[in-house]
């Protein structure tokens, strides 16, 4: 886990909204973009940054690509923060 990259990814409100939407469920990119009211290109940028920092996991099922939270990373981040 790159703490700097993770924290930087969390600074953007759109990315935080994406993470909130993915809390407890998988979603496809089109549904995320539509719900947020952003372009597919903009969503792709944000999802790539979230994936690069291991905050989101991508999985393929049939003809769809689903995105979901990487809860393991959040557990590690919480444990690290509890040190202080």
Each PLM stretch: what is its role?
Residues 1-7:
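Short, Lys/Arg-enriched N-terminal segment that forms or immediately precedes the first helix
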Residues 51-61, 68:
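Beta-hairpin "wing" of winged helix-turn-helix
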Residues 13, 24-30:
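Short capping segments at the starts of secondary-structure elements
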Residues 34, 45, 51-52:
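Alpha-helical residues within the helix-turn-helix
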Residues 21, 35:
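Residues within the alpha-helical elements of helix-turn-helix
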Residues 28, 39-42:
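Helix-turn-helix DNA-binding motif, specifically the short coil turn and the N-cap/start of the second
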Residues 16-20:
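Pre-recognition alpha-helix immediately N-terminal to the DNA-recognition helix
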Residues 3, 65-84:
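Conserved segment of winged-helix/HTH DNA-binding domains
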